[in-house]
Amino acid sequence: MKKYLLGIGLILALIACKQNVSSLDEKNSVSVDLPGEMKVLVSKEKDKDGKYSLMATVDKLELKGTSDKSNGSGTLEGEKSDKSKAKLTISEDLSKTTFEIFKEDGKTLVSKKVNSKDKSSIEEKFNAKGELSEKTILRANGTRLEYTEIKSDGTGKAKEVLKDFALEGTLAADKTTLKVTEGTVVLSKHIPNSGEITVELNDSNSTQATKKTGKWDSNTSTLTISVNSKKTKNIVFTKEDTITVQKYDSAGTNLEGNAVEIKTLDELKNALK
């Protein structure tokens, strides 16, 4: 009789362990908030293998996994109705989540999104061959870089969406180049992978007396525009990803008034006149 009861007890214990993996709720788990407005349920108890069970729902897809830690970090996986595979990786310090969708083979990427605690994110989409075709980088301040029509050589179209307007350009050699043209003047903003921007101004005007030149100061993120060696304007690209303009006096020696934030593409073009 004792052996029978022990056997029943062992079976019930195993069932309980399996229940940790198959179904978690508010009674047997703890909910942990994650970057990207996600949540993961973590079992209060370890399973038969000494691991904590994890469960999360992303885009209406249920994902499951296990972890050695009870804080919610680990890897969860699931399968969509079309047999494509999903994988959610939660960093050990919970500061980053990586959600990936693979084709049925489990290797060829379809999409990938990395969310960070500071509310920034990187979202990528891949073509039928698993090659990167689109990419969106959302900064913590809400501005973003959008890349489309990315080819196998890494070139493509680029757009920087600022608070009030957007700049357009190209992606090539791991560098984003955004351009604004006003008459003979071309303003180019370069953003390398390192993120440290540089800005240059080129004027095709052949008349030296009215030809504009630009000098970039990386320490202050300021482009100083001059005409005939006389300073006329400062255009500042702030750390908050806004752009301001301030004029010099007629002698070109002192700045006048206050810097004014540029809020439209037309206002930026006017600053180049």
UniProtKB/Swiss-Prot annotation:
One GO cellular component, as annotated: cell outer membrane
Alphabetical UniProt keywords: Cell outer membrane, Lipoprotein, Membrane, Palmitate, Plasmid, Signal
UniProt main location, coarse: membrane
Full protein name: Outer surface protein A
Subcellular location: Cell outer membrane; Cell surface
Family according to the record: Belongs to the OspA lipoprotein family.
S-diacylglycerol cysteine lipid attachment residues: C17
Top-rank lineage group of the source organism: Bacteria
Record membrane topology: Lipid-anchor
Signal sequence annotation: 1-16
Residues where lipid is bound covalently (N-palmitoyl cysteine): C17
